[in-house]
Structures are given as structure tokens and as C-alpha cells.
């Protein structure tokens, strides 16, 4: 807050909105982006979430509606800000040995091909509003993760990034290497952040802005979406012919994690029908396109048959069912 106050000043609007709005303003001043570019990012995010059954918001908004929603901190309006959400996620990690012993799982196993955690460097004190929200550390983490995975930004056709505010998505398009430096707003204007464009499809889930921001579970929500994309299960919003995906998640203060996922069979994804998902999985439905509550039977199915402990579970099951 002290650094922000010394550079851009502080007012009574929400502090996080000020941090990221200031970063957006800096990009506008340096490269010529306009307020409409941030609004267009939000429009795309809300459009994407219409096909995500887990999204907190599934309404589709026009650019005018987004621009005319209440101003939070210029240039960001309400519909360009992520909500605080409730949510949970889980991922199962297995060894290569485990997978090799189960070849029937390989066509929907996803490899963590590269992963890097970075923290703020002395660049944080550059008096840049962009670096204050993680631009520099995101750039370094992305470069290192891609090098580890043996890919370049041009190999990535789908990503989930931390769009807590639309301004952060815009600067990250630049920081993650999806465009030439200073050209992120041109990418947005050309339609290159969504289906049918020439760039990467950003946040097919709707992102934090529209899918929601369950804070501690946000990273796993991003992971789940990209796994479903790479498997081909997200058949109502699939980014076709993809074999690699990027995930970006950050927290101020500051740390960022960038992960590169690949299909374990190294093939490109293809659309999988709901019926095929049922055949290939333990689900009775396709969880990528249909959200269902968890039953007691579902819970029992995944609990250990060898080391389960009824005393440790206590009344957890009853409490969960009551909430659901």
C-alpha cells in the first residue's frame, strides 16, 4: 500500500482493485491500450462461462453493459472484477510407474511437463504498477516453465490465467509471451483471445471474472479445466487440436506458479462424447459439462478400502450432505 500510495495514490475503493487498475493504467500510458480493451476481455470471459456448469455467473453481457456497470476504480467496472466464491477441487498425482502399469489410463492422463514458482525480485521496487501486481515474476516464471517443458508460447493454444481483474489478463497476455511486447490490446481487439482467433483461447472456463474466484481452490479449478480440455471432455467449449496448455496463478506479496500440461500420450486432443466419458471413467456422467452434487455413495467409492477410519470421519459425511 505504501508503494502504491507513493506512486499512484490511494483512495477509498477496494485496495486490490486499485492495484490492478493502476497496472492497467500503466499499460495504457505506455502502449496505447484503452478502457474498451479491458471491457472486451470481461465480455469474452462472461461469454466463455456460459458453457461452464461450474461457473458462478453464466450470464452473457454486451460490451455496453460491461462498460456501463458501476465503476470500481477506473478503468475497471464491476463486471470486470472477480467475485469471491466458494468452491473446492482435487487432483490425483501418480508416478510414471503407476501409469505404465495401467495403460488404459494413458489416453486421459495429463503430464505436468513444466512447473515453476517465482517470487518478487528487486524489480518490485521499480515503482512500476505492473510489477507491483506480479508482471515481472509472471514473465520469469512463464519463461522458465516453458523452457523446462521444451515449448514456446506459440505452442500454447489454451490457457487459464489469473484474471482477478480484466487489467491483469491484459498485462499477462504480454508477460506470458502471447504477443509482442506492448501489443496485448491489439491481440484483444483482433479477437485473438477466444475461439476462432489466431492466438490462445484464454480462460475457456470463464476465468476468475465469471467462473469465480474461490481463492485457495482457484488453482485447482484452473487445473481441472485444462485437464478436461486436454482430455477432450469439455466437449461444449473445447479448444480443438491441443496437446499442451498453460496455467498461471498468483498471489500478491508475492508469488506466482506457472504450470505447463501435456497429454501423457503426446497426442492432440479430440472431442469426446458424454457417452465415451462414461465408458472411460468411473463417472456416470461427464463432469466437464454437467455439475452434480456428491452423494454418500460417491464418497464411499473413493475412500480407501484398506486404511479408512470411521472414527476419523466422525460426522463429516452428515455435515456435507446437510450443506449440499
Predicted regions and their residues:
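Short acidic capping loops at alpha-helix termini that bridge into adjacent secondary structure
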Residues: 36-37, 152-157, 181
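Phosphate/pyrophosphate-binding loops at sites that engage ATP/ADP/AMP, CoA/4′-phosphopantetheine
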Residues: 27-32, 141-155, 234
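Flexible glycine-/small-residue-enriched beta->alpha junction loops
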Residues: 1-31
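Condensing-enzyme catalytic core mediating Claisen C-C bond formation in acyl metabolism
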Residues: 40, 71-140, 144, 192-205, ...
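Acyl-CoA/ACP chain-elongation machinery
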Residues: 42-56, 120-125, 165-171, 216-220, ...
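Cysteine-centered functional microenvironments
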Residues: 7-14, 23, 41, 46, ...
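Stable alpha-helical structural segments in soluble proteins, enriched in small hydrophobic residues
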Residues: 90, 99, 137, 141-149, ...
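Short glycine/threonine-rich loop-to-helix capping motif typified by GTGT followed
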Residues: 124-129, 163-187, 214-217, 252-261
Amino acid at each position: 500500500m505504501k508503494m502504491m500510495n507513493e506512486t499512484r495514490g490511494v483512495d477509498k475503493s477496494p485496495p486490490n482493485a486499485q492495484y490492478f487498475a493502476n497496472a492497467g493504467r500503466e499499460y495504457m500510458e505506455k502502449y496505447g491500450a484503452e478502457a474498451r480493451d479491458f471491457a472486451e476481455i470481461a465480455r469474452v470471459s462472461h461469454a466463455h462461462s456460459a458453457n461452464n456448469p461450474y461457473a458462478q455467473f453464466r450470464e452473457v453481457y454486451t460490451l455496453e453493459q460491461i462498460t456501463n456497470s458501476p465503476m470500481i476504480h477506473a478503468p475497471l467496472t464491476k463486471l470486470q472484477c472477480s467475485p469471491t466464491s466458494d468452491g473446492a477441487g482435487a487432483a490425483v498425482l501418480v508416478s510414471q510407474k503407476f501409469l505404465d502399469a495401467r495403460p488404459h489410463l494413458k489416453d486421459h492422463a495429463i503430464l505436468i511437463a513444466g512447473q515453476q514458482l517465482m517470487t518478487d525480485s528487486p524489480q518490485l521496487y521499480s515503482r512500476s504498477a505492473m510489477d507491483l501486481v506480479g508482471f515481472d515474476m509472471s514473465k520469469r516464471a512463464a519463461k522458465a516453465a516453458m523452457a523446462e517443458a521444451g515449448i514456446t508460447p506459440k505452442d500454447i493454444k489454451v490457457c487459464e490465467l489469473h484474471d482477478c481483474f480484466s487489467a491483469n489478463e491484459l498485462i499477462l497476455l504480454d508477460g506470458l509471451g502471447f504477443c509482442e511486447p506492448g501489443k496485448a490490446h491489439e491481440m484483444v481487439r483482433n479477437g485473438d483471445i477466444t475461439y476462432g482467433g489466431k492466438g490462445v483461447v484464454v480462460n475457456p472456463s470463464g476465468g476468475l471474472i465469471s467462473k469465480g474466484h474461490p481463492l485457495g481452490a482457484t488453482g485447482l479449478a484452473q487445473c481441472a479445466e485444462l485437464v478436461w480440455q486436454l482430455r477432450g471432455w469439455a466437449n461444449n467449449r473445447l479448444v480443438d487440436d491441443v496437446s499442451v496448455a498453460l496455467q498461471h496463478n498468483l498471489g500478491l506479496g508475492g508469488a506466482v506458479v506457472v504450470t505447463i500440461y501435456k497429454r501423457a500420450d503426446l497426442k492432440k486432443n479430440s472431442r469426446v462424447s458424454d457417452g465415451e466419458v462414461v465408458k472411460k471413467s468411473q463417472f456416470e456422467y461427464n463432469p466437464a459439462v454437467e455439475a452434480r452434487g456428491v452423494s454418500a455413495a460417491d464418497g464411499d467409492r473413493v475412500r480407501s478400502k484398506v486404511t479408512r477410519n470411521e472414527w476419523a470421519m466422525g460426522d463429516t459425511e452428515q455435515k456435507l450432505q446437510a450443506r449440499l
